[in-house]
Curated annotation (Swiss-Prot):
Extent of Low complexity compositional bias: 106-128
SUPFAM superfamilies named in the record: Homeodomain-like (SSF46689)
A single GO BP: negative regulation of transcription by RNA polymerase II
Any one GO CC term of the record: nucleus
Region (Disordered): 90-148
Species the sequence originates in: Aedes aegypti (Yellowfever mosquito)
Keyword Nucleus: yes
Basic and acidic residues: compositionally biased ranges: 90-104
Gene name as annotated: abd-A
Main function: Sequence-specific transcription factor which is part of a developmental regulatory system that provides cells with specific positional identities on the anterior-posterior axis.
Protein name: Homeobox protein abdominal-A homolog
Keyword field: Developmental protein, DNA-binding, Homeobox, Nucleus
InterPro entries, per database record: Abdominal-A, Antp_homeobox, HD, HD_metazoa, Homeobox_CS, Homeodomain-like_sf
Family, as annotated: Belongs to the Antp homeobox family.
Length: 239
């Protein structure tokens, strides 16, 4: 088993023509490399005293320790430069992607605005073309609204209807009274029919008055034509 502190050292042997032979490249064992990396992790530069201690511990010369640290610092600078270039390239790519994204968003917004403007133009043209028909139909709606906003007209119509039914009841009663030649049973049936007609007419007018909101003038008109219904309405208002 080989000793981890073994090292290869090339001696200075005389070359051809008496020239000194060039020293070969120093090879480090795994243990030596790990110890040097550990020391470089904490200190990138070593003092002369620390170089002597490490050289004695790893069975290396002080010059070998110095050269190894110089090479390691150069390697670290190259690594940092490569990382910086990679980060710069990533930043440029990210900026390009953001720019493309912003351009796509702007184009989509412009397309949406153009579509919205076209829709508004179409709706405006349709409204302008349909304005004549809407104006023609406005007369019927206005007449209906005016009729609805004048409840007195409706009240007068209902009043005429109630009085008309009352007149029908009275007329029927007068015609029935002229039929004196009938027998008593027939006269009783006729009187019952007459009373029912009068009551129905009375309730019709009374309900009409209660259903509507009468003014003082309309109430006076009802009192003149039908005093019984007016008195009944007055009693209900007092209650």
């Amino acid at each position: 088993m080989s000793n981890p502190f073994d090292r290869v050292v090339c001696g200075d042997f005389a070359g051809p023509n008496g020239c000194p032979r060039r020293r070969g490249r120093q090879t480090y064992t795994r243990f030596q490399t790990l110890e040097l990396e550990k020391e470089f992790h904490f200190n990138h530069y070593l003092t002369r005293r620390r170089r002597i201690e490490i050289a004695h511990a790893l069975c290396l010369t002080e010059r070998q320790i110095k050269i190894w640290f110089q090479n390691r610092r150069m390697k670290l600078k190259k690594e940092l430069r490569a990382v910086k270039e990679i980060n710069e390239q990533a930043r440029r790519e990210r900026e390009e992607q953001d720019k493309m994204k912003n351009d796509s968003l702007k184009s989509a917004q412009q397309h949406h605005n153009s579509q919205k403007q076209q829709e508004q133009t179409i709706v405006g043209s349709q409204q302008s073309s349909g304005g004549g028909g809407g104006g023609g139909g406005g007369g019927g709606s206005s007449s209906l609204g005016s009729h609805l906003h004048h409840p007195s007209i409706v009240a007068q119509n209902d009043l005429k209807l109630g009085l008309g039914s009352m007149g029908v009841g009275v007329g029927v009663g007068g015609n029935l009274s002229m039929m004196g030649g009938l027998d008593n049973k027939t006269n009783q049936d006729i009187l019952k029919a007459r009373g029912s007609l009068v009551r129905e007419s009375f309730f019709t007018v009374n309900e009409t008055i209660l259903r509507l909101r009468w003014t003082t003038r309309e109430y006076v008109i009802v009192a003149l034509f039908y005093p019984v219904a007016a008195s009944s309405l007055l009693l209900k208002f007092r209650d």
